[in-house]
Amino acid sequence: MSAKGWNASKPSERILLTLRRFKRSAASETKPATQAKRMEPQACRKRRTLRISMNHTSQQKDQTMSAMYLKIIRDVENAILRLWRRSGPLERTSNQDLEYDVIMFMITAVKRLRESKMLTVSWYLQALSVIEDSREEKEALMIALRILAKIIPKEMLHLTGDILSALNRTEQLM
């Protein structure tokens, strides 16, 4: 080492720069002043927001609506089956030509709702083609559909297809 680079009374520039860098890095690692600020009351701390995409929330809403819808369909199906069992055996056996009554149409419609989750116009037209010219059966079909439109909650009617929601709207207009 040369005598020129070292002076006991005054350190060289290179040593001073190294010493400053060391002090800065040591000070930045501990940061005692900033830690004291963080120890202050937590009420001042900024709240973090949780961001959830709209797609995720709409999927969750659809899932809950679907689960509620299936539960309602099961409840309606159980209620209709209890009603059908309560109707006497004489009434069931008296219709030898298999004329559909209101309860039988409701059972058929609820079964369709459970399987495909929709009652469409094509299903309605198919039901009309099966009952052909029987005025009583056409009335029974309409009564059954109106009852279903009233039983199923309004916020779930759009899930059932187009028939029940249309019947519910026409009932509200009358």
UniProtKB/Swiss-Prot annotation:
InterPro entries linked to this entry: Paramyxovir_NSC
One Pfam short name: Paramyxo_NS_C
Similarity annotation: Belongs to the morbillivirus protein C family.
Name of the protein this chain belongs to: Protein C
Species of the source: Canine distemper virus (strain Onderstepoort)
Lineage, broadest ranks: Viruses, Riboviria, Orthornavirae, Negarnaviricota, Haploviricotina
